[in-house]
């Protein structure tokens, strides 16, 4: 589901077919600035982790499902930034946990990055809340990667009381887990949404926001398709790994005059974007039903595949910078060696979407 192997990445140069539909400009709502959070599955978990750590003064919590160890694919880091490798992503981060660095190494890097001003001060992480999940049958991302990520949060001040960690307690494959929608629970296959009689959406939102009203049995709100290209450098979404169109779920209560709502960002994994699955992910992972009855807007940014033809100026190294499975950028593809930081292309794009929704300037 994530980038399977480095050789697979080098061997795939064609993007999946299809184009995004026309979409409107993303609007603004009355958002409680203290109630903005993020979650994700697989590559989306790594990106959720990157967003949370880069902007911990704003994101009050994160949900990490089957992924999420900050800087896991980094080979070296210095005062100029990082040098990541896809081979570390597919090796240590996914299948060879013995090659992972100690949690103290990742935590110290985060402190150094904060000292450089590339991410928010780490003190914000100590005031956060965290949901983490790894399935017992996950054969894509080794559970130790998720455990190591949780350990890093602890070293940076996250209290145990603010953590909900399902550590191989459920026989789930590599997937976002639902009560009844998707393939059988232990499977490691598309669409990577598994029916496990476990309401992961509820657990994520309850961990981050506390007690919830009962989920809606029928959605009251609407889905909004919005233009993501304006958030991409130069308006060119494809070379950045961004799909042209993102999606937003707006509960009816959030469109009532004077109503204040919360905002939760949900990030799909590889092979789960609208480019690949249409509306399957953003309609069927169960988040909207809980959001609807609890005044939570849900932002679903969309990644896309990147192939050599998407780069405007051909270079011999383009083949090393592609993204054949539509993953979020957690190993520095598309020449983005700043992908971990506030000025990383995708981190910045999603951050600007959040700022727009909250009615703030960048």
For each of these PLM feature ranges, what is it?
Residues 26, 75-78, 83-93, 180-182, ...:
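Cap/lid segment of the alpha/beta-hydrolase catalytic domain
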Residues 30-83, 116, 213, 361-362:
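Primarily recognizes the serine-hydrolase "nucleophile elbow" in alpha/beta-hydrolase
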Residues 41, 129-138, 268-269, 302:
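Conserved strand-to-loop "acid loop" that flanks and positions the catalytic carboxylate
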Residues 72-156, 161, 204, 250, ...:
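The feature captures the conserved acid-bearing segment of alpha/beta-hydrolase catalytic domains
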Residues 93-115, 194-201, 208-258, 339-342:
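N-terminal cap/lid segment of alpha/beta-hydrolase-fold proteins
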Residues 154-184:
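Catalytic histidine neighborhood in serine/cysteine hydrolases
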Residues 259-271:
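Short beta-strand element of the alpha/beta-hydrolase
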Residues 278-296:
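Short amphipathic alpha-helix adjacent to the substrate-entry channel of hydrolases
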